Amino acid sequence: MAGSVNKVILVGNLGADPEIRRLNSGDMVANLRIATSESWRDRQTGERKDRTEWHSVVIFNENLAKVAEQYLKKGAKVYIEGALQTRKWQDQNGNDRYSTEIVLQKFRGELQMLDSRSEGGEGRSFGGGGNRNQMSDYSGGGGDFGSSGPSSGSSGGFSRDLDDEIPF
């Protein structure tokens, strides 16, 4: 068993369009602001209360950054899986500042669009794991948080003429 686990899963809405930039190395990076909300009733007053948390997400996986740039817009509902990282930086006055972010590294992390406007309202899942040569993984089912398998060519999914016969 591993000594520790650093895994963050969020389901929320984008507060703004993704911010896309390039590092000095030429690698594409996407920055997202995701809102997660919870609501409850106050036991004493019966009043409905809401609280929204804002999360900074940084995508270093070039393929996932391209997906974010092309498909994600303000208000989009997404599933994000990454790791929590805190970085130290200095402001204009030389004071140390800290930022905690959910980071999707080159070969780790997942991004799924939950309210895709594609045919049939299906969500799309894009994973960054493994050493596959395919650009991204596609999951045709909106409720599946995992990956169904590598995409085949430009079709973006599995062939529709699969044999309907179950092999067992």
Swiss-Prot record:
Region Disordered: start-end pairs: 113-168
Location of the motif Important for interaction with partner proteins: 163-168
Alphabetical list of Gene3D superfamilies matching this protein: Nucleic acid-binding proteins
UniProt feature, compositional bias: Low complexity: 147-159
SSB domain location: 5-111
A GO cellular-component term linked to this record: nucleoid
Record-linked InterPro entries: NA-bd_OB-fold, Primosome_PriB/ssb, ssDNA-bd
Signal peptide extent: none
KW DNA repair (keyword) present: yes
Gene Ontology biological process: DNA recombination; DNA repair; DNA replication
Single Gene Ontology MF annotation: single-stranded DNA binding
Keywords, sorted A to Z: DNA damage, DNA recombination, DNA repair, DNA replication, DNA-binding
SUPFAM superfamilies reported in the protein's UniProt record: Nucleic acid-binding proteins
The organism's place on the tree of life at top rank: Bacteria
CDD domains: SSB_OBF
DNA-binding region boundaries: 54-60
Function: Plays an important role in DNA replication, recombination and repair. Binds to ssDNA and to an array of partner proteins to recruit them to their sites of action during DNA metabolism.
Subunit field text: Homotetramer.
Protein name: Single-stranded DNA-binding protein
Organism annotation: Brucella suis biovar 1 (strain 1330)
